[in-house]
């Protein structure tokens, strides 16, 4: 989907695909979120630092998020840098390298986030509400996983999830800004 808007020399990309936390195996809750968080940590062509240097040097941004049903992405750049942004998006979605050292750093960040959430009464109330309301339904499960499930996730799980759930089937991509639809 494309919409031209030449009020600014920038473009915004946004999209989603079927890879939300509903696809997490019961014993590996948080897998979808882990994969989404890992996409920008390195690809087969670029390291974590290289990706961020490319984005920073062009003033662009690119990020990923996970929901219950879908995972998504958002990016912004100058119109002239749209090919660069789309190439990085494509690399992150189709060629993530899941480097071991970066995955362990990310695992520790996720575990720290879970520990902080465990101290937040609002978070705990929401989690308890979901468990009571949805019982045995996947909606009762924590999207971010548990400390135990995050510890069980191996690099091979990340690779398998990405290969199985990421791809053009069902993906929606919108580009809005200083670009012609034909571009």
PLM region spans:
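Non-catalytic, conformational "gating/processing" segments within enzyme and secreted inhibitor domains
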Residues: 127, 155-183
